């Protein structure tokens, strides 16, 4: 895992003048803004549309010498609308959208005129530890004034942390107060590139606002490509067609999204599992165009080199037990069993572990379907499936087996719609002991449950031959 852009590129982007529009017209940026999910709260709260953006709101930004391109990106990736446009304030400070906008622009001028320290903490998060102590402030102090970095660096922890405290972010993944957020600087840079701008020199790449990454080429789209596009569209729609669950306090979430409540607005971020699922869906669509789709597109250590399943479980069980108290991968239960399967059979089912991936053949999102959603046959495993209306059997249990629990199970897991998963450590006639992650946001823990209750929740097992 590495930064998406180089340190030099991030710094060049943040050193751009805060009034730089990157050669994009008000209409181009207004049209982009209206199509962004993160703009919906502002659109709904203040009645914003492309027309009044161009006629009313953007001229106000220009009056204050603030780039409409940068300001509207800031709004989108903060999910503004709870506290004015950019969510600097907890609640709206004006009676309408224009007043709220003007107060945000006045805040930006205040940041330019008064020193505010770089943000490396937030109310809901632990402070981040820099990779190179003091490097962020040294860069911040070196800026000539009225740059975009002068606005962003004292205002948002997330981008600063991922650029200047990268190792902290990688090693402290999880729900708040850990690192639950992505990098808004990446999102801003990506958006500028998509609109045809050069984030690092401040100009336009194409000069006509077209996406530089889209070639002209052959405009003919094959029927198979169109079919794959429709499959991907449907899969993405299904992926996001789930409710957010109330986790605690102001926090909500599901396996796709994390959300924190600001007044009446939920600020949402894509989870690593959500991103992983999207990447896998895209990979699967690409796989369907492979002339030999039956051949796995990932490589793993040869199974003969790994020894028998029981030997591999025995060799790795102590390692798994040593992870108790730690967050693995993105902190989800899915990542934990992905980490385990990679060590025992050479393949993972979670991108967040950084291991070779099994091919996806079905449901790659829900923990209750892990045994059916991935092509375990290439990993020399055994699959036990318990159809709806049946319960697990004690005689099927194996040390090191991955178990899958049903959605909305009640005791002992009280699962939501995604179910749950973990690793069997041991069992007796009356109890079972498992290693699991993300019980109410927990790291890897050891839990002991009533055996019959545990068996009643099972949808399947994955054992290692």
Curated annotation (Swiss-Prot):
The active site is at residues 333, 420. Residues 2-205 are annotated as: Glycosidase activity. InterPro entries: CHAP_dom (IPR007921), PlyCA_N (IPR048974). GO terms for biological process: killing of cells of another organism. GO terms for molecular function: hydrolase activity. Residues 213-226, 289-307 have a biased composition (Polar residues). Changing residue 404 to S: No effect on amidase activity. Changing residue 87 to A: Almost complete loss of glycosyl hydrolase activity. Keywords: Antimicrobial, Cytolysis, Host cell lysis by virus, Hydrolase, Viral release from host cell. It catalyses: Hydrolyzes the link between N-acetylmuramoyl residues and L-amino acid residues in certain cell-wall glycopeptides. Changing residue 333 to S: Complete loss of amidase activity. Changing residue 78 to A: Complete loss of glycosyl hydrolase activity. It is an enzyme of class 3 (hydrolase). Its EC number is 3.2.1.-, 3.5.1.28. Residues 204-226, 289-309 are annotated as: Disordered. Part of plyC operon, which contains plyCA, lil and plyCB genes. Component of the endolysin PlyC that degrades the host peptidoglycans and participates with the holin protein in the sequential events which lead to the programmed host cell lysis releasing the mature viral particles. Once the holin has permeabilized the host cell membrane, the endolysin can reach the periplasm and breaking down the peptidoglycan layer. When associated with the small subunit PlyCB, the large subunit PlyCA displays 2 catalytic activities, amidase and glycosyl hydrolase. Cleaves the amide bond between N-acetyl muramic acid and L-alanine in the host peptidoglycan. Contains two catalytic domains, a glycosyl hydrolase domain in the N-terminus and a cysteine, histidine-dependent amidohydrolases/peptidases (CHAP) domain associated with the amidase activity in the C-terminus. Part of the PlyC holoenzyme, which is composed of 1 PlyCA and 8 PlyCB assembled as a ring. This is Endolysin PlyC, large catalytic subunit. It comes from Streptococcus phage C1. The gene is orf11.
């Amino acid at each position: 895992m590495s930064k998406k852009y180089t340190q030099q590129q991030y710094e060049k982007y943040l050193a751009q003048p805060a009034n730089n529009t990157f050669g994009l017209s008000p209409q181009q940026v207004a049209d982009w803004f209206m199509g962004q999910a993160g703009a919906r709260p502002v659109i709904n709260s203040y009645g914003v549309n492309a027309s009044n953006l161009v006629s009313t709101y953007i001229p106000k930004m220009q009056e204050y010498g603030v780039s409409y391109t940068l300001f509207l990106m800031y709004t989108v990736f903060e999910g503004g609308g709870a506290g004015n446009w950019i969510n600097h304030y907890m609640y709206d400070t004006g009676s309408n959208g224009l007043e709220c906008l003007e107060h945000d622009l006045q805040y930006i001028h205040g940041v330019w005129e008064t020193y505010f320290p770089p943000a490396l903490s937030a109310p809901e998060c632990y402070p981040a530890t820099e990779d190179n102590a003091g490097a962020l402030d040294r860069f911040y102090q070196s800026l000539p004034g009225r740059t975009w970095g002068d606005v962003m660096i004292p205002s948002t922890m997330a981008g600063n942390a991922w650029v200047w405290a990268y190792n902290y972010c990688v090693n402290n993944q999880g729900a708040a107060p850990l690192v639950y957020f992505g990098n808004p600087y990446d999102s801003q840079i990506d958006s500028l590139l998509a609109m045809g701008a050069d984030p690092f020199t401040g100009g336009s790449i194409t000069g006509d606002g077209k996406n530089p990454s889209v070639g002209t080429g052959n405009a003919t789209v094959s029927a198979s490509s169109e079919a794959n596009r429709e499959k991907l569209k449907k899969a993405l729609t299904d992926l996001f067609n789930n409710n957010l669950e109330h986790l605690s306090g102001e926090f909500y979430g599901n396996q796709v999204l994390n959300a924190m409540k600001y007044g009446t607005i939920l600020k949402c971020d894509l989870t690593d599992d959500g991103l992983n699922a999207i990447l896998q869906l895209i990979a699967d669509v690409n796989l369907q165009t492979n002339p030999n789709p039956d051949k796995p597109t990932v490589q793993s250590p040869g199974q003969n080199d790994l020894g028998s399943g029981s030997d591999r479980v025995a060799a790795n069980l102590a390692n798994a037990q040593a992870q108790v108290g730690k967050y693995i991968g993105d902190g989800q239960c899915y990542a934990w069993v992905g980490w385990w399967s990679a060590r025992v059979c050479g393949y993972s089912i979670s991108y967040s572990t950084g291991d070779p991936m099994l091919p996806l053949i079905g449901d790659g999102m829900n923990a209750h379907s892990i045994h059916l959603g991935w092509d375990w046959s290439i990993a020399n495993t055994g699959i036990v499936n318990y159809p709806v209306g049946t319960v697990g059997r004690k005689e099927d249990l194996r040390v090191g087996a991955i178990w899958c629990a049903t959605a909305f199970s009640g005791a002992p897991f009280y699962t939501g719609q995604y179910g749950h998963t973990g690793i069997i450590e041991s069992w007796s006639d009356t109890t079972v002991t498992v290693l699991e992650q993300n019980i109410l946001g927990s790291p890897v823990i050891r839990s002991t449950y009533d055996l019959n209750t545990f068996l009643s929740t099972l949808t399947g097992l994955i054992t290692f031959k």
